[in-house]
C-alpha cells in the first residue's frame, strides 16, 4: 500500500556519485546515492544474482509491506531470487535529499550494480513504479551498453506529471502534529490513530501510515514516564514535505502534439491498472505506449493497491509475465 496522488475515483550515509539522466540525451546530472536497505528470499540452490525480481514500494511504504507477497511469489517461483527494497527516506534506508525520481533511480542502479544482478525484473508500485520507469528509461538515455534490466512491471501509476493530492499534504501535516506533541501524550498506536481519524476516515489508510510510527520505548513495557522521549515517525517528514512537487513530477516529458518522447525502454513491460483507480487513464495511456512500446496493459477489479486487494490475481499476472516474456 502507498499513499500517492488521488487514491481512486471514489474520490545518512551517502555514497559515490552516480551518473544519472536528464530529459534529453545530453550529459546527465549527478546525484549522491544511498545504500538501500533490503530483504531477500533466495532459492535453495544459492542463486542470488540470476533473474531476480526487485520490488520497489510506494510512498510511506517499506519492504515490510511486501513480506507476505514475496513469500507467496517465492512459492510460485522458487528458483528466482526476490529482493524488496526500502527506498530512500523510507523504512531502514538512509534519509537524504533530493527526493526525486532521478535520485531514486540512481539508488536502484547502485543496488543492482553492487549486487551484481543480471536479467533483472523490476517491479514498482505507485512512487516505486515511477522510480522503476525512470530507471528503465535512463538506460538508453545514458547510453549504457551493459543493461541488466530484462523486464519491467508497473503497478497503477503512469509516467506523467501532476500535482500531488491534498490528502498527501494533509497526512504530512497531521503526522508532524503528532511528532510535536509533548512526551507522554502518544503512548500507543491507538493514541496516534485518534489524532489521525478526523483527517482520514479509512482505517486501512490510517493503519498504513502508522506503520511508520516509532513509539516511545517505555510505552509497551512500563508506565514510567520518560520526559525526553516522544513518538516519532521513521520517515523524514521535513524532506517529504518539501519534495511534494518532485514526487508529482517525472524526469521525462511526453509531447502530446507529436507523441514524441526523449527516450524509450523497449523491453517487455507489464502495466497493471486497478479499474477503480484513476491513476492510469485514457489521457496518459498514449504516453505509456510511447515510452514503453512493448507494453501490455492488464486490469484488475481493484483500487490503487491492486496487489493488496487482489493478491492471487496479481501474482498470477506477474508470474505468467515473468515466465512468458
In which residue ranges do the predicted regions lie?
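Catalytic histidine-centered segment of alpha/beta-hydrolase-like enzymes
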Residues: 299-316
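Conserved serine/cysteine hydrolase catalytic core
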Residues: 46, 217-301
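Alpha/beta-hydrolase active-site loop signature
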Residues: 60, 87-91, 159, 303-306
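The conserved beta1-alpha1 loop
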Residues: 54-58, 125, 273
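Alpha/beta-hydrolase fold catalytic core
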Residues: 1-54, 71-81, 117-118, 320-325
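Active-site loop/oxyanion-hole signature of alpha/beta-hydrolase fold enzymes
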Residues: 39-47, 67, 74-123, 127, ...
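Serine-hydrolase catalytic-loop signature spanning alpha/beta hydrolases and amidase-signature enzymes
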Residues: 58-68
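Flexible "cap/lid" loop of the alpha/beta hydrolase fold
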Residues: 133-138, 144-192
